[in-house]
Every structure is written in C-alpha cells, then in structure tokens.
Amino acid sequence: MSKGCRTNTRLAARVTTALAVGALAATSIGGWSSAAGPRAAGIPTPATMTVVPAVADINPLTGIEGLPTGPVIAVKIDDTALGRPSLGLEKADVVYIEEVEGGLTRMVAMFASATPNVRAVRSVRSSDIELLGQYGRIILVASGGAGVTLRKLDASTLHSVINDRRQVGFFRDPSRPAPYNVVSELAKVSAAIEADGVRDVGFAWAGDDPRLADAKPAATVSTKVGATAVGFVWDAKLARYVRTVAGQPILTESGDPVAKPNVLVQFCEITVDSSVIDSNGRPTMFTESVGTGQVVLFRGGKRITGTWSRPSLDAPTTFTDTAGKPLLFAPGGAFVALARPGTPT
C-alpha cells in the first residue's frame, strides 16, 4: 500500500484557550522526580466552560500543539510482570487497559505523536475492533490472534499488521523470552501503510477546570480491571499520574515512568466471549465500549464523576459530568481503564 496518511473529514480536538494553571500539591513515589511538567493551558473564566472546535495544529489525542501528520497506530501490549519493562509505551498518546481472559489485562496503546519501537506486542481480541472503531481506518498492530478474531478483524475497517502473518516491521528481542519478545517498529509500519490520521474521539482538553477547586482529593487511584489491580499515584512534579504495581512505579526500559496527566476509569459492561478459549480452557472477555455508563476522571490530584456515551461503532465517546457539561482532560494524553460497573474506585 502507498506511504502516507489519509485525510480525515472529522476535525482534530476540542480545546480551550490558555490563561492560568493552578499550583498543585506534591506527591512523590519511588524516588522518581522531574522538574519539568507537560504543556498546559487554562480556560478563560470559571463561568465559561465552552468547548470549542480546535484549530488545525492541536493533537486531539493529547490536546497539545502540533498536529501529527502520520497515521494513528494502535498496538496491543502485554500488561503482566513477564512483559515488563515495556519498550516505547511512554511515547503513547492514549493507553487503554482492558480485561482479557482469566482476570488478566492487556493494553491498547495509541500512537500518533511518535513512532517508537514497541514491546511486548501481544494478540488481538474482538473487543479491540469495537473500541478502535471510533478512531476510523487506523492501523492495529498485534502479534496474532484466534482465527475467529482475525476473521472479524479482516472484515473490519482497521488495517491489521500481524506478526504471525509475517507482515511489516516486526522482530524478536533476543534478550527477552517468548512470547514477550515481539517488537514492532512503528516507523516502518507508518511508512508502509496508508491509514487515517488523528480525529476527534471525544476528549475535551483544557489546562484548568474550575470544578477542580471543589472536587475530592485523589492523590492515588486504586481500581481493578478484571481481577488485576490497577493503581496510579499523582506526582505533582511531573504533573502526571504514574502507574504503579504494589505501590512502586512502573518504568519502561528507558527508565521513564508510565505516566499521563489523566486517568479515566470507564465502567463498561463486560461479557464472556465463548468463541475464543485460551490454552487453559478460559474464555476471553468482551468489553462493550459502545453504549453508556459511568466514569471517574482523575486529574490534578482530584476526581470528578460523570458519564460516558457512544451511540455507534464509528462515533466518538462523549464524556460529561453529572450536570451534563463536558469533562475536561489536562493536555498530555490519558490512561483509560475499562472496568466492570460497580468496581470500587
């Protein structure tokens, strides 16, 4: 296929103009610290919470100036101790955490701002096809998948790049054990496949939000996806939530923390997908990302509750507070944990 990026009809991000950024209290973890924080922009007045269409140079997946010119690439990444440290994950714009089989989790990492080498690439699930429909005709990179899942993927609008099919941009890291050693060279994938670039998938970005003044403090986030504990700690020096395991920060191979300014816990109906059974006899799970449900947004060491709504496969997801106003994400990307309804958070 030809090199390049297909022009999108749906325009970039939602963002508000900058005025001020409030100072935030510090929490430090695991000895990690940084004097630098991500770019942020405030909103005009506390009375104004209008979300306006973005100018063309704002990345709708981060809210940061500089519109990516290449295709969006989604990568399935391992989320267990055996797959750590990951490679390249810190360069992702948005990272979804989803339930698979046996209570375990995998990640779907969205790359538009950068095209690093990424490890450990793992297999696709049917849930991914539904989740990624809102991004358009983008690229999905995976190590493989069950036959029935690959047939569904082939029938979808996604451009699949699968290691088991000996497609472009894969190699195995000899320092890591299989199956945790599959690496995708995203620069090669981006150059080889024509696919959609960034589009609005529902994130509204603003460097400040007057609702935070009265919001509940949330220096830590503790929830579950499946049977897997998913935790984060707010680091004010980084101005980000750092993902943790047993209270310790998760670092990538480069030594960078796995961190984003926002953590969204999105409560979704999750059902058994009996069409796929793993080698231990366990069915995989299907996360319903089309529909409606509750959310909790964590940003700036605070938490705000609300709802999500996505009416169809190709529609963006709308996030609103309890009054129906858009939830505002801090520029810099987000984690999205797809949890079962009622999961303590």
What annotation goes with each model-predicted range?
Residues 2-37:
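Secretory targeting and sorting signals
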Residues 42-43, 48-94, 101-111, 115-345:
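A surface/extracellular/periplasmic glyco- and lipid-processing/surface-interacting theme
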